[in-house]
A protein has these predicted regions:
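Nucleotide/phosphate-binding catalytic cleft detector across ATP-hydrolyzing
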Residues: 1-46, 65-78, 98-170
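Active-site-proximal alpha-helical scaffolds that flank and shape metal-associated catalytic sites
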Residues: 47-51
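Short beta-strand scaffold segments in enzyme catalytic cores
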Residues: 54-58
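Active-site-adjacent segment of 2-oxoglutarate/Fe(II) JmjC oxygenases
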Residues: 86-98
Length: 170
């Protein structure tokens, strides 16, 4: 990124000259985290749980620690697929994704309880695995706060057992 600090180029017939003074590369989701107004001090972990991946960054006073940034192919979509299969297996019915998403977001939906139960069991297992993966990377809830962003935050909020003083859903 800083190989060429002095750049000349043309765009729409106009000539431009740009000097790059400095550049930083931060984990996905960092912008949402850094703009969070809450009191963020000391050792923290940022987990950005998106559709396809979970990005994890260990931080010290809001700054990512070099060598402590990880990406797992373990996003909400993996949970969605398992929930869809579980409903099919238990209820012999295909449930549209938007209903599963509603259960993920709200913890419930206007469907029979057996469907909610099947989806919820998968979601509970998924969030247990999320916390397990975080611990594998070095997350210790006694020593660090966890900040969760992305769609997976709804799953944590609705289906995980956690200390709300130590886990913040942004």
């Amino acid at each position: 990124l800083l190989c060429e600090k002095d750049i000349h180029f043309k765009y729409n017939g106009e000539s431009y000259h740009v000097v790059i003074a400095d550049a930083s590369i931060h984990p996905q989701g960092y912008a949402a985290f850094i703009n969070y107004d809450g009191d963020i001090r000391g050792n923290t972990v940022l987990a950005d749980i998106g559709n396809g991946t979970m990005n994890v960054a260990f931080m010290q006073n809001r700054k990512p620690l070099a060598g402590k940034i990880f990406t797992e192919q373990f996003g909400v979509y993996q949970c969605m697929k398992k929930a869809r299969n579980e409903v099919m297996r238990n209820c012999q019915c295909e449930v549209p994704d938007h209903i599963i998403e509603e259960v993920f977001r709200k913890g419930t939906a206007d469907i029979p309880e057996r469907y909610i139960q099947a989806i919820s069991e998968v979601a509970k297992d998924y969030v247990k695995q999320v916390f397990s993966k975080l611990r594998e990377y070095g997350y210790n809830p006694d020593l660090m706060k966890l900040y969760v962003i992305g769609g997976g935050g709804c799953l944590i909020k609705n289906f995980a057992e956690y200390d709300a003083d130590r886990v913040v859903i942004i």
